Amino acid sequence: MAVFCASSARLALPTLLRNIYRSEFASELHSSRPVSLRQVSYSHNRFNNGRSFASLSRLLASQSGSHMNPQPSSQPIITESSSEQLDAAEDGSIVGAPTKDAAVNRDRRDPDKPTRKTKKAKFASSQTEPDATSAKSSRDKKHVRSDRASPDYKPKKKKEPWQIQKDALKKKFKEGWNPSKKLSPDALEGIRHLHAVAPDKFTTPVLAEQFQVSPEAIRRILKSKWRPSETEMEDRRKRWEKRHDRIWSHLSELGLRPKTKRTEALDDSNILYGKGEEGNKPSE
């Protein structure tokens, strides 16, 4: 007949599970401080595995020892140690939790207040901006110096007074202040003479239409008081005679003017066939 053993019945699996859960609930009820559900669930999930393994390891050790020396007081010791371990763990979690809650509450209180890191970053960026501008200006100065040191660099010369006046005339008269048609010295004297004899009849627009020049050119001719000397007049006369002969020979080649002995030496055919000034025929 089988004999019932009280110590072995106490170490059975249902009894062990019942004692473990009873010790856990007793330790949770033992804590006197009010803890939020969030903190309890966090601490329970954090320390649940550690407590269960520690209690089971100790129970297995006590079970092996009970077979050798059965002591009825071993089970209460295990439950007390597990309850003390749970209390210490929960106290530690409760003590450490307010620091995290305080930080969260601080952030909720001042959501718009910048942190120290953002302040330091802004201060560093404000210091780097003037440094970048100064570095850029120094680079530009070095670039200008290198351009000046290059052999192709030419410094800008100061304009002469006549250059400044010429630029001003170009801006004022975009088509050009010089007349497109050159007038001979005889034509210039004729314009001055006609305007002096009958200024009401030979006005500036009438003279400009008659000589086919701009009114500004007629106005400058009448306003000018410069008169050439005798030698200058002779040189100008010779130049205009040559110019006249050159134009006449060109028109005669085109068939617009008759050929003359005076303009025959200026024909382009003399250059083509190698005729000299004496009019020698080319050698065959």
From Swiss-Prot:
Residues 67-85, 124-136 have a biased composition (Polar residues). Coiled coil: none annotated. The keyword Transit peptide applies. Residues 62-184, 258-284 are annotated as: Disordered. Disulfide bonds: none annotated. It is found in: Mitochondrion. Residues 103-115, 275-284 have a biased composition (Basic and acidic residues). Belongs to the RRG9 family. PANTHER family: NEUGRIN. This is Required for respiratory growth protein 9, mitochondrial. The lineage of its organism: Eukaryota, Fungi, Dikarya, Ascomycota, Pezizomycotina.
